């Protein structure tokens, strides 16, 4: 058993602790003097504003989050619009091969498509004939039913509102309103060409060119052309379709855009069943 070691005197322990504390105090004081005073910095407020764009071309989506004008002029999104609304985007037209308005309407909920003959097409919704057609949100009462089955090559999307649209078409119509929204010029250059060959000697060519023209993109243009020829399983029946569309846009101000355009579509069938039994 080891002999017990003598305890240090209490006064010696206190002296050692006091000396250690006194030795550290100057170091703390020096650090406190060297630390710079922190002054809070107040940043200026940053306001970010933007406009929602309803264009569907290049979005890769079957819907749009931008405002629609078919049901009202309030620039409401499809979710905010208090009516039954369907939108067929450019992406869906291309992926499903929806070439004409009639083919598009066959994919829309609540729309009945009736082919009266090889050329004339009528639409019904909620038990009534659809007579309200819009182009870029402007009411257009087509004088011929042939225009009601135009080529989709010039359109960015097609909006369909089921029920009356009295806010945009006056008295409204209990059936539906079909709004065909055309393509707009882009701020960057783009060009697309397509060729299609199918059964019954189907031959189709498309060209779509868009981009800035002058004034650092404040003047833009777009040109779209398509031509199609085809025969059919019906004897002697042939199709000869064409579409031409051109538009110019100019920025007159931060919130003002002037647009002028021209569209022409033709249908020159041979051996159609129009007027025959």
Q: How does the language model describe each region?
A:
Residues 1-96, 102-110:
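N-terminal Sec signal peptide and the immediately downstream disordered periplasmic leader
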Residues 113, 122, 138-162, 180-182:
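Short acidic/polar hinge/loop motifs at secondary-structure boundaries
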Residues 53-55, 198-200, 228-230, 265-269:
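Structural signature of outer-membrane beta-barrel domains
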Residues 153-156, 167-246, 252-256:
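Outer-membrane beta-barrel translocator/receptor signature
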Residues 39-41, 104-124, 151, 171-174, ...:
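Short, glycine-/polar-rich solvent-exposed loops and beta-turns at beta-strand/coil boundaries
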Residues 262-277:
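Flexible loop and strand-edge segments within Gram-negative outer membrane beta-barrel domains
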Residues 85, 93, 105, 158-163, ...:
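Non-catalytic regulatory/gating segments with a bias toward low-complexity or hydrophobic composition
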Residues 45, 49, 102-104, 122-124, ...:
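Outer-envelope exported proteins of Gram-negative bacteria
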């Amino acid at each position: 058993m080891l002999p017990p070691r003598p305890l240090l005197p209490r006064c010696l322990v206190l002296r050692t602790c006091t000396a250690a504390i006194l030795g550290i105090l100057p170091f703390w004081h020096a650090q406190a003097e060297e630390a710079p005073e922190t002054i809070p910095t107040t940043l200026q407020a940053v306001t970010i504003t933007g406009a929602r764009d309803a264009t569907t071309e290049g979005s890769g989506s079957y819907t749009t989050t931008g405002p629609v004008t078919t049901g009202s002029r309030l620039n409401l999104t499809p979710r905010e619009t208090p009516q039954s609304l369907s939108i067929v985007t450019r992406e869906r037209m291309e992926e499903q091969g929806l070439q004409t308005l009639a083919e598009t309407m066959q994919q829309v909920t609540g729309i009945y498509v009736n082919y009266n003959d090889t050329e004339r097409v009528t639409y019904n919704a909620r038990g009534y004939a659809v007579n309200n057609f819009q182009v870029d949100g402007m009411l257009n009462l087509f004088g011929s039913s042939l225009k009601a089955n135009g080529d989709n090559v010039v359109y960015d999307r097609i909006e369909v509102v089921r029920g009356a649209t009295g806010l945009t078409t006056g008295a409204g119509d209990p059936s539906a309103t079909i709004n065909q929204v055309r393509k707009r010029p882009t701020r960057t250059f783009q060009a697309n060409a397509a060729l299609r060959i199918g059964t019954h000697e189907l031959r189709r060519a498309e060209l779509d060119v868009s981009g800035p023209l002058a004034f650092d993109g404040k003047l833009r243009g777009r040109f779209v052309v398509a031509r199609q020829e085809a025969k059919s399983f019906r004897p002697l029946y042939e199709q000869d379709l064409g579409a031409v569309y051109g538009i110019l846009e100019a920025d007159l101000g931060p919130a003002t855009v002037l647009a002028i355009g021209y569209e022409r579509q033709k249908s020159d069938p041979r051996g159609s069943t129009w007027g025959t039994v």
